[in-house]
Amino acid sequence: MNKFWNFIEQNDERELFLEGAISDETWWGDEITPAAFKADLASGKGNITVWINSPGGDVFAASEIYTALKEYPGKVTVKISALAASAASIVAMAGSEVLMSPVAYMVIHNPSTIAIGDSEEMRRAIATLDEVKEGIINAYEAKTGLLRDEISDMMNRESCLNAKKAVELGFADSILYNDGENDDTASPVLFSRQSVMNSILEKLPPKPDTPGWVNIQDRLTWLSHYKTKNQSGGK
């Protein structure tokens, strides 16, 4: 199993590094990967610093990490070293304090998927994406206090925020290494969904010979089946 996270223990302080794409390669194919992450998180005590440099990836894997970090009993400090884009920005919202390097960026946009089928299946895919978007907005709203419509509009525009703008809007709390002498931090750069996707594809390992997920609806169907199986005690 290829982990996209790494824990480092230092006395009473812990550091978690999330680097590269948040891959769903084994996350949804079985229950092993989320259990492994939770076990790693629970294996130590004390406050934890989460370093993020990620172009994003799977929204459901990011949601699992977000929830696990919110449940963690110690203080969770998020530090964005370079990029928290797409699904990685969801993870960043789990921090009780979010700090960004002056040259770091946060990118938020609408969720996307690939759907194949007739018009009814297309409508179901659209409805599912709308619901997933509402879930993402929940995390942004809880952190920033911004109006949902305002957040939704930012996602529609696919917004790239430099450190200063992220602090101004409430997505981050402060800027690292800022001595107050120069408020002109990083200038914004342009990101597109395609550039984020290309970055993800470059970092992902070769796809194993295991069944993949076609779209978000497939994942939700699998989750429903998995929960039903567990509740009935089936194999």
Where are these regions (language model features)?
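N-terminal organellar transit peptides
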Residues: 1-79, 83-87, 95-235
